[in-house]
């Protein structure tokens, strides 16, 4: 009986070898897919560090120079006054809670700006996101500090001309041992390769993710007060929680009457749930493809065992 069994195994060793190889390849692919899905699941359930619900991006355009309403030879002070007036008119709307201006810094932004930070001889390596903003930008996305600071308290830090750094700023730096971002609190640091001016670290933020699935260096952040609103390329607002309904339509209806100021006008209103969906579409499609691939492999394994 044993001889017959060994003889059968010997005769079928080639087919058994191919079966073992097939199972090995399937196992490796399955391990990769399961690992990818697990990591994605873990990432998407980590705190974002911001709240973009009830938030909108307000796109501000400039009149064409050929427009009969275009104000030629406007001074820098006039442009600044137009921007200030537009900001105040948005802020006066009863449904708007906060208005913020910034430069390449809102969540799910396809553009970003990098910087560095130096304290004494310590300088974190790798990419650090630089977010320049007005104080109320903090309130729009409700950033918070590691010591329980509220958005209002963090906004006051920016008003004082101090900066905010993320809790993970010094992570992933083997050359910085035993030091955390909290150790920089209250210290004067150099930012953006400029050693002629120092900024005081006024607070440490809870880690601010670049997007739901992002990890690593793209989540390291420095927030600075923006110099003037002329540097701002982004306008954002937070609408009161119970006043979202018809906000976009109502604001559009008032654009020509109240929001054409000098050469500036509101050109578009985009809710952040739409911005988020657009930014994450490719990643979420890839995750769905991974699920489909895992299901296909499991089906093949099941059919192979029958």
Residue ranges of predicted features:
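Intracellular coupling helices
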Residues: 2-7, 303-306
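Hydrophobic C-terminal alpha-helix "anchor/cap" residues
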Residues: 9, 90-91, 255
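Hydrophobic alpha-helical transmembrane segments of multi-pass inner-membrane transport and secretion
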Residues: 14-39, 284-306
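Short beta-strand segments
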Residues: 22, 57-60, 100-103, 164-166, ...
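Membrane-proximal extracellular/periplasmic loop immediately following the first transmembrane helix
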Residues: 34-125, 130-131
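Generic structural signal for small/hydrophobic residues in well-ordered secondary structure
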Residues: 40, 58, 90, 96-99, ...
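Hydrophobic secondary-structure segments that place a key small or acidic residue at a functional site
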Residues: 124-219
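"Rare, low-scoring activations can occur
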Residues: 167-171, 193-287
């Amino acid at each position: 009986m044993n001889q017959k069994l060994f003889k059968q195994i010997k005769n079928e060793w080639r087919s058994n070898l191919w079966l073992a190889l097939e199972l090995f390849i399937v196992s490796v692919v399955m391990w990769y897919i399961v690992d990818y899905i697990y990591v994605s699941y873990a990432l998407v359930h980590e705190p974002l560090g911001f709240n973009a619900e009830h938030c909108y991006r307000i796109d501000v355009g400039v009149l064409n120079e050929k427009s009969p309403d275009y104000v030629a030879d406007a001074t820098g002070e006039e442009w600044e006054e137009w921007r200030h007036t537009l900001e105040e008119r948005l802020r006066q709307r009863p449904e708007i809670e906060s208005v913020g201006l910034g430069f390449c810094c809102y969540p799910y932004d396809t553009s970003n700006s990098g910087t560095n930070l130096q304290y004494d001889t310590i300088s974190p390596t790798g990419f650090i996101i630089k977010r320049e903003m007005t104080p109320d930008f903090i309130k729009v996305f409700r950033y918070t500090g590691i010591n329980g600071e509220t958005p209002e308290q963090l906004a006051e830090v920016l008003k004082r001309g101090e900066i905010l750094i993320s809790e993970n700023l010094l992570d992933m730096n083997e050359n910085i041992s035993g030091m955390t971002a909290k150790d920089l609190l209250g210290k004067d640091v150099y930012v953006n390769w400029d050693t002629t001016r120092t900024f005081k670290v006024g607070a440490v933020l809870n880690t601010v993710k670049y997007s739901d699935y992002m990890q690593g260096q793209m989540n390291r952040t420095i927030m600075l007060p923006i110099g003037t609103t002329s540097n701002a390329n982004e306008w954002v607002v937070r609408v009161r929680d119970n006043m979202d309904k018809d906000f976009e339509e109502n604001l559009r209806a008032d654009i020509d009457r109240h929001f054409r100021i000098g050469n500036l006008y509101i050109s578009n209103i985009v809710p952040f749930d739409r911005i988020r969906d657009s930014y994450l579409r490719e990643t979420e499609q890839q995750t769905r493809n991974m699920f489909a691939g895992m299901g296909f492999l499991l089906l093949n394994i099941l059919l192979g065992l029958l």
